[in-house]
């Protein structure tokens, strides 16, 4: 399977945990940048109230997402110290059966899930600043 794999997740932040979330997110970004050389983009966004956090990941392929899940296991184990619940998860691009099985472990009732496996058209620029 070729083509980009994009993952978008939105979480609520526990009351009183915004500063911890900011600190831990900064640490996570540094870790990902250092340890995941294939990751094309990794961005975290807060809403204006500081009550929701959205994570946007752009991978060159699904294998990069599989690697991301493996190397970030420690972060995932402690993320809900400051995050309350996941509101949605979105996946764009083809994924392997192994990745689909791994991601299904995180599925929860009531969470909005979007999977769009067919990359119809597009391009990626990596040299534009």
Task: Go through each PLM region and give its residues.
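Short S/T/G/P-rich N-terminal loop/turn motif that feeds into the first structured element of a domain
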Residues: 1-53, 60-71, 82-129
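A short, acidic, amphipathic alpha-helical segment used as a generic capping/interface helix at domain edges
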Residues: 73-77
């Amino acid at each position: 399977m070729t083509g980009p794999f994009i993952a978008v997740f939105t979480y609520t932040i526990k009351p009183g945990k915004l500063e911890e979330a900011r600190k831990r997110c900064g640490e996570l970004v540094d870790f990902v940048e250092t340890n995941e050389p294939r990751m094309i983009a990794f961005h975290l966004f807060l809403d204006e109230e500081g009550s929701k956090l959205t994570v946007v990941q752009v991978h060159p392929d699904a294998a990069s997402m599989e690697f991301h899940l493996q190397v970030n296991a420690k972060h995932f184990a402690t993320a809900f110290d400051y995050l309350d619940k996941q509101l949605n998860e979105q996946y764009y691009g083809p994924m392997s059966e192994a990745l689909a099985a791994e991601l299904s472990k995180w599925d929860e009732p009531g969470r909005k899930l979007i999977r769009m496996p067919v990359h119809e058209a597009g391009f990626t620029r990596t040299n534009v600043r």
